[in-house]
């Protein structure tokens, strides 16, 4: 009996001393969502905006540069869409799609007479950001990217009151002011409009 107790005690000591703490199984990080085009991001933000105001209308769609998304192929990992509501006491609210999630920003005042917040009917947005890029590439973008392949590309779509049309601004650079090239493309037809810089 003593031998059995000693054997069990020795076995217990060996097990306690020699066993390593169990390591947790390596957890794979979920792969971030792929970059998407402006119209895909717009649709996701539009649903959220309609929950805020049933009459929400877009006035601007723009891509946001991130470390791992430089606007290639007309896609981005982050898009911001500005919506305005005439019935919500003339207010506006930005919505952002980033890595698969939609969030909203701070509500702000909205004036229909302000040219930078002129709302547009989404039916005019027939040309997506990747198609706008194709047009811009044919008008100087391809040559610029050959010389400077790391140049980021931004996309902005808004209503142009002077020409009364929805316009894509394909911007080769980190912002519109310091851009190396800006190309305007009709967002309804995909036609080249002009080189803005």
Predicted regions and their residues:
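Long, terminal "pre-/pro-" and other extracytoplasmic accessory regions
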Residues: 17-197
């Amino acid at each position: 009996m003593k031998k059995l107790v000693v054997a069990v005690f020795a076995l217990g000591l060996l097990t306690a001393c020699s066993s390593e703490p169990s390591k947790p199984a390596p957890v794979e990080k979920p792969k971030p969502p792929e970059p998407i085009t402006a119209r895909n991001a717009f649709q996701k933000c539009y649903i959220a905006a309609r929950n805020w105001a049933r009459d929400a209308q877009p006035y601007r769609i723009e891509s946001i540069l991130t470390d791992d998304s430089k606007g290639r192929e007309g896609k981005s990992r982050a898009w911001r869409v500005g919506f305005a509501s005439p019935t919500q006491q003339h207010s506006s609210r930005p919505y952002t799609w980033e890595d698969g999630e939609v969030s909203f920003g701070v509500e702000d005042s909205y004036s229909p007479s302000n040219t930078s917040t002129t709302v547009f009917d989404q039916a005019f947005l027939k040309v997506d950001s990747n198609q706008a890029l194709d047009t811009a590439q044919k008008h100087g973008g391809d040559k610029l990217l050959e010389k400077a392949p790391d140049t980021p590309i931004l996309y902005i779509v808004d209503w142009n009151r002077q020409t009364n049309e929805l316009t894509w601004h394909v911007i080769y650079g980190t912002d519109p002011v310091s851009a190396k090239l800006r190309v305007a493309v009709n967002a309804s037809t995909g036609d080249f409009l002009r080189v803005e810089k």
